């Protein structure tokens, strides 16, 4: 995770909050390359799920206006919305790895929100997003190895906006998330999963 020093002129800077493109009307959210070129069946599914997206954001933050300058709250909400939107995409768009990247970035932003607003449950929500990222990174690797969903066509594997650690970075992140947020009850199963990611 890349952290930025606050500047005297602009204060705290969070470039991560601007990465997702959000339609302020229907709350469709995605990476820029997926935002403009949507096939009609996907657009119809996204439109049908519009109210679910409104409810999801309202449940976390209340009302967020995506017509104004992005805030930390709006940035975190945008990654959550992208997670919901990529559920409706076909496998040729590699939605699982994109959801994994969004879940990890959402975890980072919710963690920052938790530091700024400790009275809220953002730290707990951050841990949930880390666990979701673990599941999605693991699932993306499974789908890649079985040939059901390719991730090699992605321009940037992230995880941050200015770093591209490639396919090896995906494997590394999966192992790191497994180590930090994977189940800890069954040690044999835990060691087996970590060994698979070597």
Locate the predicted segments by residue.
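A short, hydrophobic/aromatic-rich structural module that often spans a beta strand
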Residues: 29-55, 161, 166-174, 192-197
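Charged, long alpha-helical assembly modules
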Residues: 118-198
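Short coil/linker segments at helix-helix boundaries
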Residues: 1-7, 40-60, 116-133, 185-195
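Aromatic-enriched hydrophobic runs in primary sequence
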Residues: 17-18, 37-40, 46-51, 71, ...
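N-terminal cysteine/histidine-rich coordination modules
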Residues: 1-50
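Amphipathic alpha-helical repeat scaffolds of TPR domains
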Residues: 49-83, 92-118, 131, 138, ...
């Amino acid at each position: 995770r890349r952290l930025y020093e606050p500047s005297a002129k602009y204060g705290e800077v969070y470039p991560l909050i601007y990465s997702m493109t959000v339609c302020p009307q229907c709350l469709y959210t995605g990476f820029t390359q997926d935002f403009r070129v949507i096939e009609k069946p996907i657009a119809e599914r996204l439109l049908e799920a519009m109210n679910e997206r409104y409810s999801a954001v309202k449940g976390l933050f209340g009302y967020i206006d995506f017509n104004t300058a992005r805030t930390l709250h709006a940035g975190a909400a945008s990654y959550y919305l992208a997670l919901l939107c990529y559920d409706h995409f076909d496998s040729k768009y590699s939605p699982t790895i994109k959801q994994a990247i969004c879940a990890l970035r959402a975890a980072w932003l919710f963690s920052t929100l938790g530091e700024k607003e400790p009275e809220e449950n953002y730290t707990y929500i951050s841990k949930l997003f880390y666990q979701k990222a673990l599941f999605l990174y693991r699932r993306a690797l499974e789908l890649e190895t079985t040939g059901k969903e390719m991730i090699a066509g992605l321009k940037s594997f992230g995880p941050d906006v200015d770093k591209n650690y490639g396919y090896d970075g995906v494997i590394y992140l999966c192992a790191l998330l497994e180590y930090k947020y994977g189940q800890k009850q069954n040690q044999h199963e835990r060691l087996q999963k970590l060994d698979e990611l070597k």
